[in-house]
Amino acid sequence: MKLIHNAQASKSLRLQLTRGGLALLNGLGLGLSLSIGLSMGLSMALMGNATAQTAAFPTKSITMIVPFPPGGLADIVARPVAEAMSRDLGQPVVIENKAGAGGGIGMGVAARAKPDGYTVLMALSSLTVIPEADALLGRSPMFLLNELRPIARYTADPTVLAVRADSPWKNVKEFIEDARKRPGAINYGSSGNYGTMHVPMEILAQTAGVKMTHIPFTGAGPAVVAMLGGQIDALSTGPATVLQHVKAGKIRVLGHWGNGTLASMPDVSSLKDLGFNAEYAQWSGLFIPSGTPEPIAQRLRAAAKVAAQDTKARDIIQNTGSPVQYLDSPDFEKYVQADAKRMTDVVKKIGKVE
């Protein structure tokens, strides 16, 4: 648009729209009035279009990123939740596994996704650890915690110390005594540095004063397979990941990082009860990019709650050994912030792990 000022007719302001449209406007009042009218009309049209899109949400399939391979807790929870949300939303919710870096790769992809409601994330508690680890190592962050908005927590279980059923260790005492006698000889698998399987083992090692060798994998599924195949000696993971193998007599659980008794493994003692001040919980929860419009965020929040109350979804999750412990968005956000604060100190104690 060109603004033409005629010096001989200073009271007249002419607006010329090049390449068609309005050719000439005479008079300052008329020009400004039409300009304002055009701007308001365009703004209202855009707002109306956005409102219509929000009201119609969703109009296509939604991608649920799972930042770990199949077989681990995030994937175990994500699949029945996605199915239940699909029924409520009237559109498919499609699982996409993006593993690596203790879940950081997939979490980063979700954080950078377009905030339009069509990308959601089923994360584990490593979400509160990885940003702290990035800062400690001085590396470019894979994502920032405030880039993801908590929508719903589904599970929160203490991890368990698991070994093969044919291993020489029948209890935690034997395991720790052997680790003290042979520093670095016992190895354990994890889902990656600073992940939900690495952190609890480091907490135990520091508490017990032992040294073990860490072997990272891309997720709990591959790590369990490696342990069953004799490639690693032990691991810490959620009960849901190993319960089927415990029932089949292939895996023995020595203890857990919680308090009291586990409903799925009532005969397993906590590390605290056995004299080791080691505590850790592996939670799973749904997140969306922080810039997601509020009406869309609330629609996803409602669908996430429906999934938490869905009988089929609850049965599937609970039958794996992880009872549903649902938290709605506001309470889950407080929970995540508290967990992040606690993990700051844990990461500092673990130190740099390349």
Feature annotation, model-predicted:
Residues 2-5, 32, 53-54, 87-88, ...:
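Short hydrophobic alpha-helices and adjacent helix-cap/hinge residues
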Residues 76, 80, 84, 88, ...:
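Extracytoplasmic/secreted proteins, especially bacterial periplasmic and envelope-associated proteins
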